[in-house]
């Protein structure tokens, strides 16, 4: 269960609180102690209102909320990482469950996505012990030759580190080869909570926090668009959540000027159903108010990331709508196919009409976007 911090930031009276809010409105970088205060002590209504003011200053079209149509395809479910929060993966010897998606299956899924107005594949996969750089180069180049108009938003920092390791390459060279083969952008998958202790507890075999940061920085240096994520609500403390945000902010600050860097930040709640963490006694304890606090603090701490996404898939329609008034400006994708989070207990669904209606009900105008946040 979440081990909430009981320590409180000392000496934060009304005047100091106003100073912190003013700093947020100016989009100045917050100190760790200021960020802790926002998360642990700031009244939620004040916090959400301040985050909404910052959101309206950052995103020029005040009444617009963006959304996307893409399709998630799992390249394989074979994974040697053994993350304790995932019940979708299988081990290499579990041949009755193991799969690698075939080219015919990709074609069928892509044709269906295009018919629904989609423009992007979100390709996710495990750390397969036998799928190295040659496999991914062939996959990406083949898909691009067949569907040049489809963007490939694929893998994640852990997969890149794993491919590099089994292929005898550096992560930088691996990224270069993947980009040359057709990789358009890199998801923020595999971040979870960027804390070595948390990682040891929930995903001990996954590439390290340092490797995640290294791969993302190299992607930024290559001007490969990326996103950042946080999966919260398992074994982490509130301050480890804030520290995660500070690591993301500081990594974004290292992005070369004029490069894409992190285009968006997406926090989502851990779903425990059927996972090893659940067997260890760690269960989903979703609080809508806690999620709104996280969205608001994310907007205020991440002063250098423009887009904050409301994860309707894991929190549901109503909470996502409130998040749009608390710092978030994007509703993400209708996600034509999603398996990993759904297999752990998240069963919220939207079609194109439904997500637009949800945005309108929240008082905004829906606008369809692509991965670079360009309007379609």
Q: For each predicted feature, which ranges?
A:
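Mobile, glycine- and charge-enriched loop segments
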Residues: 63-65, 69, 84-90, 95, ...
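Conserved Radical SAM active-site core
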Residues: 37, 90-250
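Generic secondary-structure signature for well-ordered alpha-helical cores
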Residues: 25-26, 40, 53-60, 115, ...
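Auxiliary Fe-S-binding modules of radical SAM enzymes
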Residues: 1-45, 114-115, 245-246, 253-376
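Short, small-residue-rich loop/turn micro-motifs
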Residues: 77-79, 87, 117, 189-190, ...
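Hydrophobic faces of well-ordered beta-strands that scaffold small-molecule active sites
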Residues: 65-71, 121, 152-156, 186-188, ...
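N-terminal pre-triad scaffold of radical SAM enzymes
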Residues: 48-92, 98-124
